[in-house]
């Protein structure tokens, strides 16, 4: 039976990543504003937690990411233009918008890393996890946005009268590509370093590494 208990070192990493998420959320380190949506690098700590701590760690980090987003939507410590606008429409739905996609992202990433590691080494597994961290975050976030706010005047104006799928693609555009590239590279580098430091538990590794 696999143990779900985290070591002190792994909990330290979780705490560190949570701290980094708050730091990135309230400094220029975490967001690059391009168009109506910002490029976010906060998906990277979520991916790293999923690599080191599995679905549970990914979910916790995703929840922290969601919390920072919701606080920004409320105007606490910084403001998100889109988040603030959604909050004015519905604080409850905005909470769902902020938390659910990020938590689902973290959970999925933990399983993705485990699955990929059955066939590939740590570097490749971390790179794939980093890519999907940004990809799934965008997919889940935009899906939730369309489902809950798609009929609002705000989103209709952002779509510019275009088809929903085309409008979403145009909204994310360069932002999503930038997130995927940066998350892939950084998660691969950090995850490999943590693996060499023996901070990724056996439950996350399906077989011994064939390459570092």
Named regions from a protein language model:
Residues 1-212:
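Loop-helix junctions at membrane interfaces
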């Amino acid at each position: 039976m696999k143990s779900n208990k985290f070591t002190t070192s792994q909990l330290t990493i979780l705490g560190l990543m949570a701290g980094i998420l708050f730091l990135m959320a309230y400094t220029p380190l975490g967001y690059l504003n391009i168009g109506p949506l910002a490029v976010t690098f906060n998906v990277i700590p979520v991916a790293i937690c999923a690599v080191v701590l599995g679905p549970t760690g990914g979910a916790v980090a995703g929840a922290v990411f969601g919390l920072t987003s919701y606080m920004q939507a409320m105007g606490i410590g910084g403001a998100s233009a889109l988040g603030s606008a959604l909050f004015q429409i519905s604080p409850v739905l905005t909470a769902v918008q902020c938390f659910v996609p990020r938590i689902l992202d973290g959970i999925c990433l933990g399983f993705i890393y485990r699955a990929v590691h059955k066939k590939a080494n740590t570097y490749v597994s971390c790179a794939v996890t980093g890519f999907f961290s940004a990809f799934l975050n965008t997919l889940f976030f935009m899906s939730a946005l369309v489902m809950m706010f798609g009929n609002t005047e705000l989103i209709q104006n952002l779509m510019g009268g275009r088809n929903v799928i085309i409008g979403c693609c145009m909204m994310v555009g360069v932002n999503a590509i930038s997130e995927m590239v940066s998350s892939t590279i950084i998660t691969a580098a950090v995850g490999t370093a943590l693996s060499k430091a023996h901070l990724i538990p056996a439950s996350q590794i399906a077989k011994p590494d064939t390459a570092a």
